[in-house]
């Protein structure tokens, strides 16, 4: 994840914006679905260089977005703004997005990108876990959050009885010489939304 500030607003004169870039992740599975080890789920995954979501955002009076994934970005921004009682809005530009419903964590990465952009624009003092909880992300796996925060190969410790977000317990660099090839089936969409929870 990269965050940069100091973008001139194309929407409102004088507003400074932020740019957030975050990449996809592969979730390689859970290792304790029923909690026999004292924590449920626990998983391993890896962050990828591409595909990525690139979001630029500026303070605005309302909520707007342009680009692929605009509706999703607006929905997340409104949900988060309501949760923190934000009085302002956000104008967003998406120059690229992770393919939705392809098993690459596009929803989590979008939520974190929008949330961290809002945090930087309005100095909300939110961290990644705050954004995840307020947007309903990271409830079963911490891989998407770990990919956003630190990248590499990630293992999360699963959810304990008092754990809201599964913590990253191990992380390593992914060898640069190794390659991952993604093959997409554009005729079918992966499980998402309520289907994943069942």
Sequence positions of predicted segments:
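ATP-binding N-lobe of GHMP and related small-molecule kinases
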Residues: 1-102, 106, 119-128, 184-189
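ATP-dependent small-molecule kinase catalytic core of the GHMP/sugar-kinase superfamily
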Residues: 1-21, 29, 35-39, 127-198
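N-terminal low-complexity, intrinsically disordered patches enriched in charged
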Residues: 38, 54, 112, 116, ...
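Generic structural marker for isolated residues within well-ordered, non-membrane alpha-helices
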Residues: 77, 115, 132
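Glycine/serine-rich anion-binding loops at beta->alpha junctions
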Residues: 96-120, 139-148
């Amino acid at each position: 994840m990269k965050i940069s500030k100091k973008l001139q607003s194309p929407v409102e004169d004088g507003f400074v914006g932020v740019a957030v870039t975050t990449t996809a992740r592969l979730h390689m599975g859970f290792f304790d679905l029923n909690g026999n080890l004292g924590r449920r789920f626990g998983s391993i995954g890896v962050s990828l260089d591409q595909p990525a979501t690139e979001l630029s955002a500026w303070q605005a009076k309302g909520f707007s977005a342009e680009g692929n994934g605009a509706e999703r970005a607006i929905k997340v921004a409104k949900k988060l703004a309501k949760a923190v009682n934000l009085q302002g809005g956000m104008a967003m530009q998406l120059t690229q997005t992770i393919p939705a419903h392809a098993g690459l964590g596009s929803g989590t990465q979008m939520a974190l990108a929008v949330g961290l952009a809002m945090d930087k624009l309005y100095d909300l003092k939110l961290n990644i876990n705050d954004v995840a909880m307020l947007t309903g992300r990271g409830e079963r796996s911490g891989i998407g959050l770990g990919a956003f925060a630190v990248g590499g190969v990630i293992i999360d410790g699963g959810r304990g009885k008092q754990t809201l977000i599964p913590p990253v317990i191990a992380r390593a660099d992914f060898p640069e010489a190794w390659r991952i090839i993604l093959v997409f089936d554009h005729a079918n969409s992966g499980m998402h939304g309520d289907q994943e929870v069942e």
